[in-house]
């Protein structure tokens, strides 16, 4: 009968010997680690087991666990072992105890790793399945070495300390070999990254080429910033250009050494801590603040601080959405004047209207493109700057006169828009809304050179003439300006454009009301002037040797025009027109106050005497305040009357075209001064086809000139002539200046207001 106990023991020993021989041939052995002698002596028939390390023991235990289940089944099928086989049972007990101890150790390592990750709420270095549990995080040296594993329970046996030490040593070797899975490592170590952050910020600050960023903060004790070239974040090297000679340096030390050569020795101010030199005390003060890291200027909208006010102003623009500087020739817009000047110099463009910080247009600011001054220039009635050419500069020059008389101006109910915004600051030319008898005689200037600051102005209802700025004041403030070559005029052209723009925006109803109001005023004044004329003709002293009496109000109102003529008060009673009829009445108007006023006006402006003044060739201007005389009255004029008439007709003509003669139309004067007296007298008694003044219009209302194409009335011959000059001969709505064809009168007005013609 077969012995089942002997057969089972023999099979187990053979399998164990084969398993050990396999590991002995394939796994490298480590000397010094032997099994316990008791376990070896307890199995005399067992083959000698080679010493293994910690990893080999772990593999053995796993293999033995797999074999444990079939062995248990086999033992259940066989009878219980006899007394002779107690040694083999002790061998099984030793292996099971060793497996339990190793499992407890791995469970402790795994629990410690879980507690560490749970304490930081995230896997700092990412979870790597290739790393055994319990090993340190391979990325923890990037986040600091202060992390320590939680305390672990001390193993009970001394045999478990060696595996833990072996695992710790192997983890240090695996830190550099195990790559992270979910976290991207930094580009450089912590120390090098911190040292590179500060120079990068300084490079970005110094890369700004603006003058306002001249004194940027830098390290006080770091000489590399001033002795080495500086590169910005884009890799571009910072250059320092000399404003005097144009030499370009790449380091601050070289630039300061070169700048010293352009300074006077007695004006050099040098920094005590570095080679910085300057001629200005405030520059040295800002530089010393930089060394001391003092930044007294702070932004009220953020935490930005700086060493001077200029840098703070530049920084505040970063919080604003207003681009103050815009190019007139392209879509370029910027917040910084220095960049705007560079654009204008590079492309040869012209500047547009400068905006204030709140976004409102400011025509009084001019961009000096080639000047060294920072920011725009403010004009106070002076000549136009060299860089301020264009329509924007002319508007700003006209607007410079406005602040002198803004306080005395009443509010006018005139429709405003962008086209008429430039007229809001102008004082209005006043028209007499009351009859001449009720209106006092004002000491008005007799020439454009006379200052208009002393003229008292009374509020009146709006009229087309009230929409114009005072041309006499503008001419007096800007006598040295360049003239327009076409009409030999300067600001009259701009005034006509502005008037056309404003009148074009008035509604037809308002325009009709203004015309009816002016017509009613002129009719009332005409009736009163006729009654006064008849009364004075009867009551005044008669002298048959003199000509027709001159109206009193005519002499009172003629000086109200900005005249530049030769006033001869000795011949104030000489008639303007004479006739040979026996029934004519000749008398002298005995108004001493008016004569004294005329004499004083003539004495105050002697430089304007003897200026040739003739009517404009486009439209013959009528004598203000006179009825046209019949032609038969002029047929038999005596030679004496002809001589007196020739001497005084230019004076009457000046009342309607005085501004034209004062603005320099000498060519027209020379061409018309050779005419005889009969032609002058006939031209004074008639009007052209376009001029339609009412019959007997008094001097208070003045002559009215009408453009039949645009249905606009003018009270000044120069403005009327300028306006008619824009109408072309072949097409009345085609601009005669530039040839652009416009769509009706409104289109022509808008074209004149928006485009500069020179």
Swiss-Prot record:
Subcellular location: Nucleus
Reported tissue expression: In embryo, expression of maternal transcript is highest in anterior region. Zygotic transcript is expressed in anterior region until the beginning of gastrulation and in posterior region until early gastrulation. After this, it is expressed in developing nervous system.
Chain intervals for the UniProt region annotation (Disordered): 30-51, 172-214, 365-416, 513-536, 603-695
Compositionally skewed regions (Basic and acidic residues) per UniProt: 198-214
Chain positions with Phosphothreonine modification: 178
Zinc is among the record's keywords: yes
Residues the record lists as Phosphoserine modifications: 188, 207, 209-210, 537, 540
Stretches with biased composition (Low complexity): 398-415, 513-522, 652-695
SUPFAM superfamilies (alphabetical): beta-beta-alpha zinc fingers
Molecular functions per Gene Ontology: DNA-binding transcription factor activity; DNA-binding transcription factor activity, RNA polymerase II-specific; RNA polymerase II cis-regulatory region sequence-specific DNA binding; RNA polymerase II transcription regulatory region sequence-specific DNA binding; sequence-specific DNA binding; zinc ion binding
Residue ranges with Acidic residues bias: 523-532
Record-level GO cellular component terms: nucleus
Gene Ontology biological-process annotations: anterior/posterior axis specification; ganglion mother cell fate determination; generation of neurons; negative regulation of transcription by RNA polymerase II; neuroblast fate determination; positive regulation of transcription by RNA polymerase II; posterior head segmentation; regulation of development, heterochronic
InterPro entries, alphabetized: Znf_C2H2_sf, Znf_C2H2_type
Zinc fingers (C2H2-type) by residue: 240-262, 269-291, 297-319, 325-349, 705-727, 733-757
Keywords on record: Developmental protein, DNA-binding, Gap protein, Metal-binding, Nucleus, Phosphoprotein, Repeat, Zinc, Zinc-finger
Pfam families in alphabetical order: zf-C2H2
Comp. bias regions, Polar residues: 39-51
Function: Gap class segmentation protein that controls development of head structures.
Protein name per Swiss-Prot or TrEMBL: Protein hunchback
Organism: Drosophila melanogaster (Fruit fly)
């Amino acid at each position: 009968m077969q012995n089942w106990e002997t057969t089972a023991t023999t099979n187990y020993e053979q399998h164990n010997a084969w398993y050990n021989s396999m590991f002995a041939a394939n796994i490298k052995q480590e000397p010094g680690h032997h099994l316990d002698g008791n376990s070896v002596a307890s199995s005399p028939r067992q083959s000698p087991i080679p010493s293994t390390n910690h990893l080999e023991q772990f593999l053995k235990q796993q293999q033995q666990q797999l074999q444990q289940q079939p062995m248990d089944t086999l033992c259940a099928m066989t009878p219980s072992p006899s007394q002779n086989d107690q040694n083999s049972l002790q061998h099984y007990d030793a292996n099971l105890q060793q497996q339990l101890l190793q499992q407890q150790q791995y469970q402790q390592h795994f629990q410690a790793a879980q507690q560490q990750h749970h304490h930081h709420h995230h896997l700092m270095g990412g979870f790597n399945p290739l790393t055994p549990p319990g090993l340190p995080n391979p990325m923890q040296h990037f986040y600091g070495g202060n992390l320590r594993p939680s305390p672990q329970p001390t193993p009970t046996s001394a045999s478990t300390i060696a595996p833990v030490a072996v695992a710790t040593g192997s983890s240090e070797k695996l830190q550099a070999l195990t790559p992270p899975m979910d976290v991207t490592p930094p580009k450089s170590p912590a120390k090098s990254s911190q040292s590179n952050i500060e120079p990068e910020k300084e490079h970005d600050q110094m890369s700004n080429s603006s003058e306002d960023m001249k004194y940027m903060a830098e390290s006080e004790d770091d000489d590399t910033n001033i002795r080495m070239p500086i590169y910005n974040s884009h890799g571009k090297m910072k250059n320092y250009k000399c404003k005097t000679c144009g030499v370009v340096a790449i380091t601050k030390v070289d630039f300061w050494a070169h700048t010293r050569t352009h300074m006077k020795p007695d004006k050099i101010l040098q920094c005590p801590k570095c080679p910085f030199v300057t001629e200005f005390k405030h520059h040295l003060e800002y530089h010393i603040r930089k060394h001391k890291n003092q930044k007294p200027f702070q932004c009220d909208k953020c935490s930005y601080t700086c060493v001077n006010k200029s840098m703070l102003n530049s920084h505040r623009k970063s919080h604003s959405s207003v681009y103050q500087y815009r190019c007139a020739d392209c879509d370029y817009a910027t917040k910084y004047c220095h960049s705007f000047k560079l654009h204008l110099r590079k492309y040869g463009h012209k500047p547009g209207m400068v905006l204030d910080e709140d976004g409102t247009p400011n025509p009084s600011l001019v961009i000096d493109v080639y000047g060294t001054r920072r920011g725009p220039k403010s004009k106070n009635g002076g000549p136009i700057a060299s860089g301020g050419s264009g329509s924007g500069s002319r508007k700003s020059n006209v607007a410079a006169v406005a602040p002198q008389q803004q306080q005395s101006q009443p509010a006018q109910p005139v429709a405003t828009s962008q086209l008429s915004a430039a007229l809001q600051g102008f004082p209005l030319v006043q028209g007499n809304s009351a009859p001449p008898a009720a209106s006092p005689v004002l000491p008005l200037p007799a020439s454009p050179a006379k200052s208009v600051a002393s003229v008292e102005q009374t509020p009146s209802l709006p009229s087309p003439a009230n929409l114009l700025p005072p041309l006499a004041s503008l001419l007096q403030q800007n006598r040295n300006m360049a003239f327009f070559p076409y009409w030999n005029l300067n600001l009259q052209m701009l005034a006509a454009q502005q008037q056309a723009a404003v009148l074009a925006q008035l509604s037809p109803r308002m325009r009709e009301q203004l015309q009816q109001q002016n017509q009613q005023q002129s009719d009332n004044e005409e009736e009163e002037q006729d009654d006064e004329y008849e009364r004075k003709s009867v009551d005044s002293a008669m002298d048959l040797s003199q000509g027709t009496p001159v109206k009193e109000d005519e002499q009172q109102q003629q000086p109200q025009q900005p005249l530049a003529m030769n006033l001869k008060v000795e011949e104030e009673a000489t008639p303007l027109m004479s006739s040979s009829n026996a029934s004519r009445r000749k008398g002298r108007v005995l108004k001493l106050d008016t004569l004294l006023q005329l004499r004083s006006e003539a004495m105050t402006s002697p430089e304007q005497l003897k200026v040739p003044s003739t009517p404009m060739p486009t439209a013959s201007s009528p004598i203000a305040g006179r009825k046209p005389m019949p032609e038969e009255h002029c047929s038999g004029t005596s030679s004496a009357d002809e001589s007196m008439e020739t001497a005084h007709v230019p004076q009457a003509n000046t009342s309607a075209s005085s501004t034209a003669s004062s603005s320099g139309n000498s060519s027209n004067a020379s061409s018309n001064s050779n005419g005889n007296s009969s032609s002058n007298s006939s031209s004074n008694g008639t009007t052209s086809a376009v001029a339609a003044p009412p019959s007997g219009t008094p001097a208070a209302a003045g002559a009215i000139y009408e453009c039949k194409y645009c249905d606009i009335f003018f009270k000044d011959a120069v403005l009327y002539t300028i306006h008619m000059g824009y109408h072309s001969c072949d097409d009345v709505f085609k601009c005669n200046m530039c040839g652009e064809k416009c769509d009706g009168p409104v289109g022509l007005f808008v074209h004149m207001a928006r485009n500069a013609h020179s």
